Regions:
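A structural signal for multi-pass alpha-helical bundles of membrane permease subunits
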Residues: 1-219
């Protein structure tokens, strides 16, 4: 979960910076990039299931034909985990990209112009100006994605069913399998309450890191 969310933040920011520049076909690429975001999770899981099925999937055919690598997420725990992470990154990176674009557009240009006049490099501008100014957007996006990733169920069930073994049995999938197939309602409810408490803690951390500093500045 943390690896997927971190990857989404890095890719989302990089793509946001790319889309802030003008290049041929920019509108088309932005539209294509945003398409996964409007797809329901169960559809995403079904599409990736078809693409990764060894007999008919385009991804196993490409890897086997061009790289000599056999992909079978039904038998390899590592492959199933990696493909699940890639699917989640593909599905939710557009959300991070749109958030970062909105944050970058809202930044005032005066600090950047002054930094360039003073001879600051790109990395210096990023670390000392851009990153602190978009920190609220990064924190908000981080916690939203972490909370959402903790309850991911449908797309993982469609892709791997939580297997092989327990390789992709994430928190949401674990609760689902305990409650419905096994009717272990007490255990499932207990895990759900723990997830709820973790979500509350995440919201509190977001408040401390995002809202509280602004209130102190106003005071």
């Amino acid at each position: 979960v943390f690896f997927a969310v971190t990857t989404q933040l890095v890719l989302g920011y990089a793509l946001a910076q790319a889309f802030m520049r003008d290049f041929p076909g920019k509108a088309i690429f932005r539209t294509i990039h945003t398409l996964p975001l409007i797809m329901a999770p169960i559809i995403v899981g079904s599409v990736w299931k078809l693409m990764t099925t060894p007999s008919i999937g385009i991804i196993p055919s490409f890897l086997s034909g061009w790289l000599g690598y056999d992909l079978n997420i039904g038998q390899s725990a590592m492959q199933a985990f990696v493909v699940t992470v890639i699917m989640d990154v593909w599905h939710w990176t557009p959300l991070v990209t749109l958030t970062m674009i909105a944050a970058l557009i809202s930044l005032p240009q005066d600090p950047f112009e002054q930094a360039q006049i003073d001879g600051a490099g790109r990395w210096q501008i990023f670390w000392h100006i851009t990153l602190p100014m978009i920190r609220p957007a990064i924190l908000a996006t981080l916690f939203i994605r972490l909370m959402d990733a903790m309850r991911t169920v449908d797309e993982v069930l469609m892709l791997t069913g939580g297997g092989p073994g327990s390789a992709t049995r994430f928190v949401g999938v674990h609760i689902f399998k305990e409650v419905f197939p096994r009717t272990n309602y007490g255990y499932g409810s207990a895990i759900s309450v723990i997830v709820l408490y973790l979500t509350i803690v995440a919201c509190w951390l977001m408040y401390v890191g995002l809202i509280a500093p602004r209130n102190r500045e106003k005071d």
